[in-house]
Amino acid sequence: MKVSRKLSIVAISLFLVVGMITSYDIIQKHRSSETVKMAQTKQSNLVDRLTSATGSTIHVLNYSDLAIEKMADVYQLSIQEKIQEQLLQLIESQTATFTQPLIVSNPFLTNTTGLYLAFSTDEAVKISYRIDAQGYPSFEKNLKQNEEYATSHQYQIIGCIPNVDNLITLTAITQDGQQQQMQFHYTPPKLSTTSEMNYQLSKQESDESLSEGLFAVIGNQAGEKATYLVDNDGYIRAEMPIVNYNSMRLVFNDQQEMFMAVSDSKIVKLNALGQVKQVLDLANTDYLIHHDYILNDKNQLIALATSKTAKKQAGYVEDRIITIDLSTQEVTEIANFEELLPDLYQKATGIEEHSNNKGYLDPVHINSLQLADNQQLLVSSRETSTILALKPDEQGIYQVEYMMGDEAIWQGVGECGQLLLEKEGSFTSQYGQHSITYETAEDLSAGQYYLSLFNNNSTIMDSRIDISLAEIADKTAGKTSKYMKYLVDEKTNSYKLVESFDVPYSAYVSSVQNYQNHIIVDSGQQATFAEYTSSGKMIQRFTQKTDTKYLYRVYKYDFKNYYFD
């Protein structure tokens, strides 16, 4: 059965379908190993590290006039727009078909091993792909299109193994089920920020299969930083280099776009092709962002922040919450914990001695943020080992509604202790916790929700010289961390522990995530993460192979409606 047709030429705009690709017929055709490099002049060292022309007619754009020397240059909107213009010119100069697609190595310089593909077909098709590299697991995905079947296609292919020959097979399927395939080769560059391309696998306690998706490994202590997408076999399938700090989390909107922090003053919005579409730059504001940010339904990002003025004048850090308007980029402070908890600030006079804020005052150290009902904010305060619920009053000013934590920490701190919910049952509170996660369920009553967290179970609290966590916590503190899940009942002003299990100890950082009926846990200071069953049985552990032992967070995403269908 022959279903091959000539594929027509289409000038494909980058504003058009962000992530469409097509393949169709069964033809296993190896293209020549011709390399096409657009630049005739020397590219910068960074560009050379992020692109490769090795493979089957692989194009590399000419960046020589763009003065790209560092990742901060890559994440400038003006640079991205010039890259887009050059890519459009290349598209218009090509007769891109399914059997001879336009292939460009990492054109926007935001994914070291990524490929841009563009082509058109006479007949509407949907596209899938498989990547094979000798000695490595295969990687197969269905690509996201704006329509299920389409004739104009452009995509980012992720999943190539760095610095080895990858055979990429595209499959196009028509609406009546007919298929066509084509193949090409690509050898990406080495990863630009790490010498390791995989994580060590170990220790299985359950034979359940791992969930579908890629682990986003966020934050390390390497000189050059990146966020990595890691498959279930432990291999890095994408490297997204950043400027400094860490990406905190990946946040998606409904327009097939992803927000990613690239520094402590900049969050960018990327489309599925890897193109930077918006830059939220706080460099000229009074704020540095840290730890966490989320998207609300008012076209705003809500972010944890440090006031530069307060840091300089009073020494206070990591105690503000701001909103960033995505339309106007206006930054508004919505919470200042010095004003919300003045009695605590009178008590918490100890100087930070252990973290990156050494030498400053860190009375609350807000490290995680969740949005409960588009108004109520749930925040994790590491330094007080407390989760706080904030809600705006009639004037729109956020106030502390209630708290969850050890009452011993709040004894003698004004009337703050009266805000604590009652603990239902006998269990030890969390200490130094990170990464809270809010969830609802159909079987819960009004006013009830689940709250999961990584209980670091740490006894470090530099801000309070009047009490010692070591004297308050139980004997496991400082030895074993825990995954914990609470059922919170706002109507009875109480909460209870419904699930808990031990995980490797990490005094700082770390994360938990409830994902596809499994639990993802990162013990950051041991540079290890694992996927567990819903009952706490380990399915697989992943451990960083380098000597640097630090992973800020690990969250898993399926990337559906972004890269994949």
Q: Where do the model's predicted regions map?
A:
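N-terminal Sec-pathway targeting helices
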Residues: 1-13
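Membrane-interface motif at the C-terminal end of an N-terminal transmembrane signal
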Residues: 19-36
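Histidine-/acidic-rich catalytic cores in large beta-rich domains
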Residues: 48-51, 55-127, 131, 152-154, ...
